[in-house]
């Protein structure tokens, strides 16, 4: 009759394998959380792959929208995140594309922005800075593509490894993008469309 005290080399090997697998699972879970593998962004104003909300449309150049920056919520950023940045880029605009928004120096404690955070002053209260977009205005400039084919707008939230980037309010969005790229731990994206 076997007892719990009987020695079975095969049993020991199996126990070791199970222990190793359990430890590997824990390490993998911790590493995923550390790297922000499940980092996501969403908006109450639209869904990924859908059309951008009517309140986000630009108010000039033939477009007649309220030009309000979208509400955004992000989750599961890398554990070592020290600040966040956000960009909105039209990848279908001619030549090099079109920057609609770039924001940096959002504190790591912030996990969402309300709608119209750009114009309302909410970002300034957080200590964040905004770039000059390709409409040549500081802050958010909504979609307003030429009539014809809809354009795709990529909204990206970046987790950064620095508290602040060496940038000033009103610098070009492309410069923001370059500085953001050099300090990124992870990013989350959604893409929306708009046409007229």
Where would I find each of the regions flagged by the language model?
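Aromatic (phenylalanine/tyrosine) cluster motif
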Residues: 5-7, 18, 34
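Bacterial N-terminal signal peptides
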Residues: 19-29
């Amino acid at each position: 009759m076997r007892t719990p005290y009987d020695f079975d080399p095969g049993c020991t090997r199996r126990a070791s394998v199970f222990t190793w697998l359990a430890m590997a699972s824990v390490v993998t879970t911790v590493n995923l959380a550390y790297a922000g593998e499940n980092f996501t962004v969403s908006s109450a104003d639209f869904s990924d792959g859908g059309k951008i909300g009517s309140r986000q449309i630009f108010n000039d150049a033939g477009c007649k929208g309220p030009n309000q920056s979208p509400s955004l919520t992000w989750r599961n950023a890398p554990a070592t995140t020290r600040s966040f940045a956000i960009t909105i880029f039209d990848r279908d605009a001619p030549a090099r594309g079109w920057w609609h928004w770039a924001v940096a120096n959002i504190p790591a404690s912030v996990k969402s922005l309300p709608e119209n955070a750009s114009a309302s002053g909410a970002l300034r209260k957080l200590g964040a800075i905004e770039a000059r977009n390709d409409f040549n205005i500081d802050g958010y400039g909504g979609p307003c593509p030429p009539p014809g084919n809809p354009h795709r707008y990529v909204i990206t939230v970046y987790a950064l490894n620095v508290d602040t980037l060496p940038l000033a309010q009103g610098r070009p969005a492309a410069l923001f993008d370059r500085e953001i790229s050099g300090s990124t731990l992870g990013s989350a994206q959604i893409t929306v469309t708009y046409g007229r």
